[in-house]
Design a protein with these regions (language model features):
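Hydrophobic alpha-helical scaffolding
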Residues: 60, 75-76, 130, 142-150, ...
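Hydrophobic transmembrane alpha-helix bundles
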Residues: 22, 26-28, 135-146, 204-222, ...
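Glycine/threonine-rich phosphate-binding loop and adjacent beta-strand/alpha-helix elements that clamp
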Residues: 116, 124-146, 161, 504
Length: 525
């Protein structure tokens, strides 16, 4: 979930809101009236990594009121860094709602009233389209109806809209069925070419997956002949085969080829240089293109629209007929003029073990109103951190578990393979601290978080580093929360959440949390 854009990467500008209002067939002024102030329509919201600051306000927030409620819908709160601060936020909120097939660590974390668990069905109890990170789609068929007290996501959303009084607008032109929802996505998400993957086409690909070549992804014969498996976006029309590779000028656009997108205008003046074209050079184009070189994005085929906002999709169809990409043909951009660093520059982590590197490669200035919260960079990067916290801390995944582990740690077979939380410690570090394999240790962060975990001695980490898997939950700073789960739902595998001790640190552009480098100290428990 992105805090700075409407669906389909449309952003938050007025034109973007009006586009989606046309898709939904709702009045723009009604949408605007839902906001306390019009300025919040175009203001990025809190991100997943720092929403809790909107509650506890340890760093200054940039909105008229603190957050009062939170809904976790298939989201593991223990996947977020600074978890001990997130817990403070949970206990301060007026309302916490958890929608999940399993009671997550969030349910156990709340020491307050007004916490509601809404059991949702699993992927086997519902149907609909799903998209992979490879951009291909498939249709998920329901195996059984939702069991016990669970409801599928569609039903939960319907109940929400009815409770909040806008079901008539939410379902104005669609029914509460996945096929209609997919068609609405087809209609509105033109920016990335989601318009050609109709429910009927996706189902056909799922039903005839055996006709696709595993190497080329192309169907050989059958009803999907010549199409790429899953119709990877952009899939420009209902006749388009999908785009397996985003940049490929060896084949026509109509057959799955694409140039680079002309997303950043047609000209730019680089520092110390004259203005130059940033469209593709002459002679760089897809086979069959009417223009034998660069060209801008298509607009005004239908007056007053462009390829991203023309709901008739005539603009896209016209571009394809001319052998051209709707979004234009430009050069790859390696100089990103909107970013603080226009080209990649090394900046030392906020919590670095190397004082000389901090001096040589300092971080950014602090950033006020960074997704509605003041974010520290320079003021947080102190060379003296390493004097008290000399060990490098990193975290990552285990093959047996996924995300915060609520589902996978509730599987007894997976829990048997990885039953306990641990800290992976190098042999030399273990000997220096007098540790043996299986010893309990305390790990403390510079920000007040601490966890108690078992030592796993290994040569896979170096003598300066500790590794923590981030999937565990059910313990908090030495205390068990096993008894705080609803009866009969405690996961088989419990452990401290690594993100209690992951350090403060966020990306300057996206506000993604820093989980791969930080500092800590350890002592034998």
């Amino acid at each position: 979930v992105l805090a700075n854009t409407l669906p389909g990467y449309y952003g938050l500008a007025e034109g973007s809101w009006k586009h989606w209002c046309r898709v939904w067939d709702v009045d723009f002024d009604w949408i605007k009236s839902r906001f306390k102030d019009e300025k919040y329509m175009s203001k990025p919201g809190f991100t997943l990594s720092r929403w809790y600051e909107g509650v506890i306000q340890e760093d200054k927030i940039s909105q008229y009121t603190p957050l009062k409620a939170v809904v976790f819908w298939g989201c593991s709160s223990n996947s977020q860094s600074q978890y001990h601060k997130l817990k403070k936020a949970l206990d301060k909120l007026d309302l916490v709602v958890i929608i999940d097939p399993f009671p997550t660590m969030t349910a156990a974390a709340c020491d307050k009233d007004n916490v509601y668990l809404l059991p949702s069905s699993s992927q086997y109890e519902t149907s609909g389209s799903v998209t992979s990170t490879q951009r291909s789609l498939q249709w998920r068929y329901r195996v059984v109806k939702p069991v016990h007290e669970s409801k599928d996501d569609y039903e939960i959303m319907r109940l929400f809209t009815e409770k909040f009084g806008f079901a008539d607008k939410f379902y104005k032109n669609i029914k509460q069925i996945p096929e209609d929802i997919t068609r609405e996505i087809n209609k509105g998400t033109l920016t990335i070419g989601y318009n050609g993957q109709t429910p009927e086409r996706i189902k056909k690909h799922t039903d005839y997956w055996h006709t696709f070549d595993v190497d080329t992804l192309i169907a050989k014969g059958g009803p999907c002949d010549g199409e790429y498996h899953g119709l990877p976006w952009p899939c420009w029309t209902t006749e388009h085969p999908g785009t397996p590779i985003l940049y490929d000028i060896s084949k026509p656009v109509a057959e799955g080829g694409l140039p680079f997108r002309a997303r950043f205008g047609t000209e730019y003046t680089y520092p110390g240089k004259p203005k130059e074209s940033i469209l593709a050079a002459d002679g760089v184009y897809n086979p069959g293109s009417e223009v034998k070189g660069g060209y801008p994005e298509f607009s005004d085929v239908v007056p007053g629209t462009n390829w991203k906002t023309d709901l008739s999709q005539e603009t896209i169809k016209t571009a394809i007929k001319r052998g051209m990409a709707p979004f234009g043909n430009a050069r790859a951009r390696c100089y990103v003029w909107e970013y603080p660093d226009k080209i990649p520059v090394h900046r030392e982590p906020l919590h670095s073990p190397d004082k000389e590197m901090i001096a040589k490669y300092p971080t950014f200035e602090d950033k006020p109103d960074h997704y509605r919260v003041y974010t520290k960079f320079k003021s947080e990067q102190k060379p003296e951190w390493v004097d008290e916290y000399p060990i490098i801390l990193t975290s990552g995944r285990l093959v047996e578990y996924m995300g915060g582990g609520a589902e996978t740690r509730s599987n007894k077979y997976l829990a048997e393979l990885q039953p306990e939380m641990f800290a992976e410690v190098n042999v030399k570090m273990a000997n220096d601290y007098g540790l043996r394999d299986g010893d309990l240790i305390w790990i403390e962060s510079p920000h007040g978080g601490k966890i108690k975990v078992k030592t796993k001695i290994s040569e896979r980490v170096d003598a300066k580093t500790i590794f923590l898997p981030f999937h565990f939950g059910g313990f908090f700073m030495g205390d068990t929360w096993a008894g705080k789960y609803p009866e009969g739902t405690t996961p088989y595998a419990l452990g401290e959440a690594a993100n209690v001790v992951t350090n403060y640190g966020y990306d300057i552009v996206t506000q993604m949390q820093e989980t791969k480098t930080g500092l800590c100290r350890i002592k034998k428990a």
